[in-house]
């Protein structure tokens, strides 16, 4: 989106703070309904980021798939769960929470320090997308496919692994 600099910067800060607050709401709110609505806020802010970066197709796909389908499905599933079981024996902070937060913080710090210094193009299965075809000769959908299979191959695969683990966790919780 072609906006003047101060307006663009204000929108970036506003959407970034919406993402941070929504993410904290997803993790910290004890009521799963409120967490699901916070997840909806995060997904809407993400799609607005895509609109700011002139990726209208990806923004529309984000809204339709994640907000329109997956978040509604999560809210629907949470509505069927027994809400009173979340508040039984609710302790604000336990030893396991402290250990988990320390482990997550150390992993986060190590990733933040490692990822910017890593050259992902030295890995054998990634090539630069401009080596494949000229960018002017292909459509936006083809460019998205090329970027997913070249520049963003590793993050795309990591997201698929995270989704697989969350699906296995959901099946395990549903069986209990």
Curated annotation (Swiss-Prot):
Keywords: Chloroplast, Membrane, NAD, NADP, Plastid, Plastoquinone, Quinone, Thylakoid, Translocase, Transmembrane, Transmembrane helix, Transport
Transmembrane stretches, start-end: 10-30, 32-52, 61-81, 92-112, 152-172
Catalysed transformations (reactions): a plastoquinone + NADH + (n+1) H(+)(in) = a plastoquinol + NAD(+) + n H(+)(out); a plastoquinone + NADPH + (n+1) H(+)(in) = a plastoquinol + NADP(+) + n H(+)(out)
Record EC number: 7.1.1.-
Record bears the keyword Metal-binding: no
Enzyme class: translocase
Topology in membrane: Multi-pass membrane protein
Classification via Gene3D superfamilies: NADH-ubiquinone/plastoquinone oxidoreductase chain 6, subunit NuoJ
Pfam families linked to this entry: Oxidored_q3
Places the protein is found: Plastid, Chloroplast thylakoid membrane
Any GO CC annotation of this UniProt entry: chloroplast thylakoid membrane
InterPro entries in the cross-refs: NAD(P)H-Q_Oxidoreduct_6 (IPR050290), NADH_UbQ/plastoQ_OxRdtase_su6 (IPR001457), Nuo/plastoQ_OxRdtase_6_NuoJ (IPR042106)
GO molecular function: NADH dehydrogenase (ubiquinone) activity; quinone binding
PANTHER family, A to Z: NAD(P)H-QUINONE OXIDOREDUCTASE SUBUNIT 6, CHLOROPLASTIC (PTHR48479:SF1)
Protein function: NDH shuttles electrons from NAD(P)H:plastoquinone, via FMN and iron-sulfur (Fe-S) centers, to quinones in the photosynthetic chain and possibly in a chloroplast respiratory chain. The immediate electron acceptor for the enzyme in this species is believed to be plastoquinone. Couples the redox reaction to proton translocation, and thus conserves the redox energy in a proton gradient.
Quaternary data: NDH is composed of at least 16 different subunits, 5 of which are encoded in the nucleus.
Family classification: Belongs to the complex I subunit 6 family.
Protein name: NAD(P)H-quinone oxidoreductase subunit 6, chloroplastic
Gene that this sequence comes from: ndhG
